[in-house]
């Protein structure tokens, strides 16, 4: 965190699951090509090139030998205890985390690892692997007690009865650990500690030279004499082991083990031999063991015993009750501790607190089988219910007995699958190999792993199982809601569409076959491809059933569902809501999901054609041009069914494209019309503004004309001038002047009144004030004064009728035109110049 960053701000941490593996791959490639190697190791006259940092990180011996060396090209000669045949696999393990062992080199590898103090190996697997590789050859456990992780072995020269019991124990151990021979390292390893009494726990803390021979023999004989008691205790624990919760320290949960009556229940190793684990949250999260939640009732009891054993590494030989077999679960993470760092000897059972909608589900687990590593961080707090029993026998809770198909053997991933997992949380495959040593973790909210789902998923990609590709989901558990299985055809499944964690597809799994669902009317197609996000398979997939008993579509949802929705009740409520119309989503002609004419064909639910397998992706059918498409068709030998399907797909694609183009043309037309409408609206607003401006100008002109007319009328003194005025501007009529309109005015008067503004026209009258008229002559305004804004009418006088020389009366209507205004302006401008001369 930076200095200026607020501590309360949210922090986002990205943790890569492949970064460590990629670094190891890069370092190993550099070592093979002798790039950046800075140390040469000489072992039995054989040179090994390596990096100092890698050696110092893996071995305490190299840490002490290489730290402080400043030479550029350092040469280190290892002592005689280190052999080339034992050091080669260890060097390869340092760079690849994989150790290759055989019966010929296991002893030398063990000696070299002990000498070089590579505790990640000696603490985890040497005892187990040595037992597996040597017990078939020698018939007994051959392992010296010269390291902290080695277990005391039984003497080969015991009595015949004891030897039979020993062989029986070995046979059961070998049968239960059969899968571990296939996965040597660094796969998860599960084994059980041999039955050792407390006296041998003392010897485990002492060097081999300090342990007397008679003490070893007595302790080994004591172990054999105590075998029946341990056997009885095992049978008792098998019945009552699941009544108490199990706890782990430092975030490492104790694991389950399953013991048959022929196997002895062996206590864990002393806590003094177990390396302390740093109490960090990262280490707790990196470990892939199952952390069991629940009511921790006796957490104060057993950890107390552990602390007492740690304080007293060499206790007196007092009778101690073994706490149960401990199954080691090794984490593959680089910074994870060794197997023995998880808690030993405190496992008695698990108390599951099941959810309300689910019953207690069994967890069938073999002692020699490691747990699956695909556990997310949230799963570390999930409760589990163990179930003791054989691997091939199904065990189901009482509540769900009627909903499960019985008798399906469990199958787990083989060595190749385990090597590819690398503990990643995005495991997206539910295909398991035919190994009988491992199985996926079964949480309490999933159905039993012995249902028909595991039987179907054990086959390589069944035809009825479709898994949506290209989607990464937050968990790796396989959930089987196999109720009402009788309604389906054999090999068909109906998973719950509302399961909390849906099924995922593994990106490293083999590519799925190109699978397609088609009906007789060719109305619905779903084509599954590996990683084809743009293909129709990116939508939820529907499979129509041909069985008359099942009317709904089998739906495999690849969406992330709410964690709280689970159980049979939710499954039964959601299942009837699935409609067959959802299959049209893959053929929808546009992005909004509407139907086109080509996609609205009828599709009966009962009619379902066979699968159509194509030798090329479905995207090429729709994307390729016509010539390339024809060439591709000619290159492959296709059946009539395939050709019909291909042409139908291409036809639908062309129809969809044509419909999209048609909609695009319509949208373009609509946009063009909208643009035209906007232009017309703008032009209308512009014209209206011009009209208002012209009206304002015309009003100003009328005001000026009225004022000028009033001034002219005030200057009139004689009747001749009045007659001349009304001749050119008939505005006012004197009532008592009968001959005014007959006698023409003098020529001088005409010339003097010709440039008057009244000659512009009679459309705008000029109203004279009463005082301006000659005495005895009343003046009456004519009809032309109606449109004068500044004119005044004389009260009680009748209007006269005069002819007008101006524009017609229609021009003075409410809708004043532009032409009239221009005419008025031109006349006013033309007559104004002579008036200036006259003035």
Swiss-Prot record:
Cross-link (Glycyl lysine isopeptide (Lys-Gly) (interchain with G-Cter in SUMO2)): 381, 420
CDD domains linked: BTB_POZ_BACH2, bZIP_BACH
One BP term from GO: regulation of DNA-templated transcription
Primary location recorded for the protein, binned into one broad class: cytoplasm
UniProt keyword Repressor, yes or no: yes
Bias-annotated ranges (Basic and acidic residues): 297-312
MF annotations from Gene Ontology: DNA binding; DNA-binding transcription factor activity; DNA-binding transcription repressor activity, RNA polymerase II-specific; RNA polymerase II cis-regulatory region sequence-specific DNA binding
UniProt motif Nuclear export signal: location: 819-839
Tissue: Detected in brain and spleen.
Protein name: Transcription regulator protein BACH2
Gene name of the encoded protein: Bach2
């Amino acid at each position: 965190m930076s200095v200026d960053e607020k501590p309360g701000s949210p922090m986002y941490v990205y943790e890569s699951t492949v970064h460590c593996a990629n670094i190891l791959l890069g370092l190993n490639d550099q070592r093979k090509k002798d790039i950046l190697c800075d140390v040469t190791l000489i072992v039995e006259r054989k040179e090994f090139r390596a990096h100092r940092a890698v050696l110092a990180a893996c071995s305490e011996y190299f840490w002490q030998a290489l730290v402080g060396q400043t030479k550029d090209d350092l040469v280190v000669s290892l002592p005689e205890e280190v052999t080339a045949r034992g050091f080669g696999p260890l060097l390869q393990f340092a760079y690849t985390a994989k150790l290759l062992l055989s019966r010929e080199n296991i002893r030398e590898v063990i000696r070299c690892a002990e000498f070089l103090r590579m505790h990640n190996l000696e603490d985890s697997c040497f005892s187990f692997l040595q037992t597996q590789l040597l017990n078939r050859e020698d018939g007994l456990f051959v392992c010296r007690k010269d390291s902290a992780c080695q277990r005391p072995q039984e003497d080969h020269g015991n009595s015949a009865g004891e030897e039979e019991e020993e062989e029986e124990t070995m046979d059961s151990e070998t049968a239960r650990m059969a899968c571990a021979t296939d996965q040597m390292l660094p796969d998860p390893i599960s084994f059980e500690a041999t039955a050792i009494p407390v006296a041998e726990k003392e010897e485990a803390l002492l060097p081999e030279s300090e342990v007397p021979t008679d003490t070893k023999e007595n302790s080994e004989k004591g172990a054999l004499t105590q075998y029946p008691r341990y056997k009885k205790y095992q049978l008792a624990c098998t019945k009552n082991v699941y009544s108490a919760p199990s706890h782990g320290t430092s975030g490492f949960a104790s694991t389950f083990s399953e013991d048959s009556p022929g196997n002895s229940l062996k206590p864990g190793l002393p806590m003094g031999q177990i390396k302390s684990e740093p109490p960090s949250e990262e280490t707790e999260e990196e470990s892939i063991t199952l952390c069991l939640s629940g009511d921790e009732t006796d957490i104060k009891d057993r950890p107390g015993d552990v602390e007492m054993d740690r304080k007293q590494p060499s206790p007196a030989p007092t009778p101690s009750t073994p706490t149960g077999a401990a199954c080691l679960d090794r984490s593959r993470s680089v910074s994870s501790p060794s197997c023995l760092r998880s808690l030993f000897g405190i496992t008695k059972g698990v108390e599951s607190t099941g959810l309300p909608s689910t019953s207690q589900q069994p967890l069938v687990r073999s002692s020699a089988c490691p747990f699956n590593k695909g556990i997310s961080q949230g799963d570390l707090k999930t409760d589990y219910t163990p179930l003791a029993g054989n691997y091939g026998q199904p065990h189901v809770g009482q509540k769900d007995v009627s909903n499960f198909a019985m008798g399906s053997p469990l199958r787990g991933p083989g060595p190749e699958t385990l090597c590819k997992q690398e503990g990643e949380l995005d495991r997206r495959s539910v295909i398991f190999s035919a190994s009988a040593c491992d199985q996926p973790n079964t949480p309490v909210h999933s159905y039993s792993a012995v249902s028909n789902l595991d039987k179907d998923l054990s086959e390589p990609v069944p035809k009825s199982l479709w898994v949506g590709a290209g989607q990464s989901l937050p968990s790796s558990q396989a959930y089987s809601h196999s109720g009402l299985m009788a309604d389906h055809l054999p090999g068909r499944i109906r998973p719950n569409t509302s399961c909390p964690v849906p099924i995922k597809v593994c990106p490293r799994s083999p590519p799925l076959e190109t699978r397609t669902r088609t009906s007789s009317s060719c109305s619905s197609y779903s084509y599954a491809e590996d990683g084809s996000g743009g293909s129709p398979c990116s939508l939820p997939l529907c499979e129509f059933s041909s069985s008359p008993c099942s009317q709904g579509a089998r739906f495999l949802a690849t969406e992330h569902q709410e964690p709280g929705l689970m159980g049979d009740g939710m499954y039964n409520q959601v299942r009837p809501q699935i409609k067959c119309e959802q299959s049209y989503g893959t053929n929808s002609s546009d992005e909004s999901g509407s139907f086109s004419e080509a996609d609205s064909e009828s599709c009966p639910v009962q009619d379902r054609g066979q699968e159509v397998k194509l030798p090329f992706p479905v995207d090429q059918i729709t994307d390729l041009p016509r010539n390339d498409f024809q060439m591709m068709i000619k290159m492959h030998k296709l059946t009539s069914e395939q050709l019909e399907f291909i042409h139908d797909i291409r036809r639908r694609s062309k129809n969809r494209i044509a419909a999209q183009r048609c909609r695009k043309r319509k949208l373009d037309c609509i946009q063009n019309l909208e643009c035209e409408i906007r232009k017309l609206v703008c032009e209308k607003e512009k014209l209206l503004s011009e009209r208002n401006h012209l009206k304002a100008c015309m009003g100003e002109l009328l005001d000026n004309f009225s004022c000028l007319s009033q001034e002219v009328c005030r200057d009139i003194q004689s009747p001749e001038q009045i007659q001349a005025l009304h001749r050119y501007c008939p505005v006012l009529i004197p009532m008592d002047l009968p001959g005014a309109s007959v006698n023409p005015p003098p020529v001088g008067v005409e010339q003097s009144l010709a440039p008057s503004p009244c000659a512009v026209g009679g459309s705008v009258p000029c109203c004279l004030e009463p005082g301006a008229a000659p005495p005895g002559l009343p003046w009456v305004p004519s009809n032309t004064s109606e449109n004068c804004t500044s004119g005044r009418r004389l009260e009680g006088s009748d209007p006269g009728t005069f002819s007008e020389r101006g524009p017609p009366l229609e021009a003075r209507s409410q809708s004043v035109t532009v032409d009239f205004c221009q005419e008025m302006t031109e006349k006013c401008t033309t007559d104004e110049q002579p008036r200036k001369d006259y003035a």
